[in-house]
Swiss-Prot record:
Homodimer. Keywords: S-adenosyl-L-methionine, Transferase. It holds the Pfam family Methyltransf_25. Belongs to the class I-like SAM-binding methyltransferase superfamily. Cx-SAM synthase family. It comes from Escherichia coli O1:K1 / APEC. GO terms for molecular function: carboxyl- or carbamoyltransferase activity; S-adenosyl-L-methionine binding. S-adenosyl-L-methionine binds at residues 39, 64-66, 89-90, 117-118, 132, 199. This is Carboxy-S-adenosyl-L-methionine synthase. InterPro entries: CmoA, Methyltransf_25, SAM-dependent_MTases_sf. Gene3D superfamilies: Vaccinia Virus protein VP39. It is an enzyme of class 2 (transferase). HAMAP family: Cx_SAM_synthase. Disulfide bonds: none annotated. It catalyses: prephenate + S-adenosyl-L-methionine = carboxy-S-adenosyl-L-methionine + 3-phenylpyruvate + H2O.
Length: 247
């Protein structure tokens, strides 16, 4: 059962850096719905993309799976035999709950839920990889290597879904969308104190990039095609495609 997010409703004397600990995991479904505009749409559309891209006898990777929302959406839309989903996250609290969520919904496609570092896992025989609001928590210097590894592990014709919070090269646009996002959180019941305290905890661990930076990295990794397929304010999702004739 998900609880309402009130983690930052009272003043916190010493704000540390953000961690996906037990307290966050307990309220995460409510937190992300009230904080990330378009999150439900992204999750459901990931399932539609899976229906199009997942091939028989291949694997799907959900890197930074949190509670397994994207994994479940993918699994509901796999209609082939001999597929497997590998869901990985480095938060013990998230993984514990993810396993419970996955086990609560029976389906033919098996899911391996792994507590580990996405930088260490091998990507093999993949028809689809999901990075759903995960890359932004890696050090910027480590992001290209992960995308390179994903590209190498994708089969020809495979797809990467990359969802992120964005920064903007146009400062005026960035300011507008930043303020619209805060309006969104206020409309969902967050106070100014809650918004401010959470932002202070996240600012050193969640480092955002522009869409242009993401596309440049994807191109450098080898992806022949990439495009923004969803955006709401400063949140969105790209899809990157490996050519069907890629070596």
């Amino acid at each position: 059962m998900s609880h309402r997010d009130t983690l930052f409703s009272a003043p916190i004397a010493r704000l540390g850096d953000w961690t996906f600990d037990e307290r966050v995991a307990e309220v995460f479904p409510d937190m992300i719905q009230r904080s990330v505009p378009g999150y439900s749409n992204i999750i459901s559309m990931i399932g539609m993309l899976a229906e199009r891209f997942v091939q028989p006898g291949t694997q799907v990777y959900d890197l930074g799976c949190s509670l397994g929302a994207a994994t479940l959406s993918v699994r509901r839309n796999i209609h082939h035999d001999n597929c497997k989903i590998i869901a990985i996250d480095n938060s013990p609290a998230m993984i514990e709950r993810c396993r419970r969520h996955i086990d609560a919904y029976k389906a033919p496609t098996p899911v391996d839920v792994i507590e580990g570092d996405i930088r260490d896992i091998a990507i093999e025989n993949a028809s689809m990889v999901v990075l759903n609001f995960t890359l932004q928590f890696l050090e910027p210097s480590e992001r290209q290597a992960l995308l390179d590894k994903i590209y190498q592990g994708l089969n020809p014709g495979g797809a990467l879904v990359l969802s992120e919070k964005f920064s903007f090269e146009d400062a005026k646009v960035g300011e507008l969308l930043f303020n619209m996002h805060h309006d969104f959180k206020r409309a969902n019941g967050y106070s100014e104190l809650e918004i401010s305290q959470k932002r202070s905890m996240l600012e050193n661990v969640m480092l955002t990039d522009s869409v242009e930076t993401h596309k440049a990295r994807l191109h450098k990794a080898g992806f022949e095609h990439s495009e923004l397929w969803f955006q709401c304010f400063n949140f969105g999702s790209l899809v990157a495609l490996k050519a069907e004739d890629a070596a």
